């Protein structure tokens, strides 16, 4: 054991070096806290968030961080393809209410950080323009809009009681 897992400066620099290298001008971070999070202690998660924001600002990137709870699952599915499918549902104006709420919260922060006024991401989800914009982004990167997400051969529904 190297005892680096809880070293906030190392965690922050690892995450932020990748984000800054992408060349973005603004960045919104969703730092999770709670029983399902990497940083379960809210105070430590806050410290990580503040450290990453400062690193971003020092590099000339408009950076903000939200510390959000991860004590309960977000959305209705688990697994990469299922979670991507759920995210696409949100872009199409549907999806689970908690995912929609977090999406709008993060998008509003990004719009504000970018200095854009008069735009509400909730409207973009409702009128389909969020999905249209996402499709243009996929096409601009040479992605396949018709790519199929993998489907598991087995399915198990687990209902909370």
What are these regions, as identified by a protein language model?
Residues 2-161:
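Well-ordered secondary-structure scaffolds
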């Amino acid at each position: 054991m190297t005892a680096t897992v809880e070293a906030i400066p190392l965690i922050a620099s690892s995450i932020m070096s990748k984000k800054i290298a992408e060349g973005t001008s603004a960045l919104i971070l969703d730092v999770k806290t709670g029983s399902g999070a990497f940083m379960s202690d809210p105070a430590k998660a806050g410290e990580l968030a503040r450290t990453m924001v400062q690193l971003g600002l020092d590099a000339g990137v408009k950076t903000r961080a939200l510390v959000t709870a991860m004590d309960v699952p977000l959305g209705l599915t688990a697994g990469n393809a299922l979670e991507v499918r759920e995210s696409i549902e949100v872009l199409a104006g549907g999806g689970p209410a908690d995912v929609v709420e977090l999406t709008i919260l993060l998008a509003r922060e990004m719009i504000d950080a970018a200095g854009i006024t008069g735009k509400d991401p909730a409207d973009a989800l409702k009128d389909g323009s969020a999905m249209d914009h996402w499709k243009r982004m996929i096409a601009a990167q040479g992605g396949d809009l018709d790519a199929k997400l993998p489907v598991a051969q087995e399915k198990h529904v687990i209902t909370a009681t």
